[in-house]
């Protein structure tokens, strides 16, 4: 099964100073990468590349991320994301547009989601997202 890796995981994995708590997450990402199971949404790629101060670092990271295919999105992905947002909001659960798009894309394709963002655990109470 392919896995949508969320920005929170990429941020941990790409930090210069890795904390001990991040090592298991980094190891899982490494395994998923070597198995060819990692896919990206363009918006996650964009978030990962935001705020890179030095051009050389930006280019190096951009080129590294190009190894991972972007998922082509359809109108149905956006519509389902809106439906998920509305369902969660009506149950008092908040989330970002990007988070609900990740859930919709993963659900429609049978992918799992790899994230450290605890909001996704709240989403699971109301929508069918599959966390790794």
What are these regions (language model features)?
Residues 10, 45-48, 120-121:
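A generic structural signal for short hydrophobic patches within well-formed alpha-helices
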Residues 34-36, 64-68, 91, 109, ...:
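Structured helix-beta-strand junction loops
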Residues 55-59, 88-89, 130-132:
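Short, hinge-like loop/turn segments at secondary-structure boundaries
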Residues 1-40, 50-63:
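Short, well-structured N-terminal submotif of metal-dependent ribonuclease cores
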Residues 30, 103, 107-132:
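Acidic, PIN/NYN-like endoribonuclease modules and their adjacent C-terminal/linker elements
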Residues 69-116:
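Active-site neighborhoods of divalent-metal-dependent phosphate/nucleic-acid chemistry enzymes
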Residues 6-7, 48, 81, 106:
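Generic structural signal for small/hydrophobic residues in well-ordered secondary structure
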């Amino acid at each position: 099964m392919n896995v949508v890796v969320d920005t929170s995981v990429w941020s941990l994995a790409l930090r210069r100073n890795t904390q001990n708590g991040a090592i298991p997450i980094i190891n899982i990402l490494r395994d998923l990468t070597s198995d060819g199971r990692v896919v990206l949404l363009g918006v996650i790629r964009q978030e990962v590349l935001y705020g890179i101060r030095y051009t050389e670092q930006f280019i190096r990271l951009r080129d590294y991320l190009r190894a991972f295919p972007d998922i082509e999105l359809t109108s149905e992905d956006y519509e389902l994301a809106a439906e998920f947002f509305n369902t969660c909001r009506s149950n008092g659960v908040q989330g970002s547009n990007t988070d609900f798009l990740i859930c919709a894309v993963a659900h429609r394709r049978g992918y799992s989601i790899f994230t450290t963002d605890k909001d996704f655990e709240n989403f699971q109470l109301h929508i069918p997202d599959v966390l790794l």
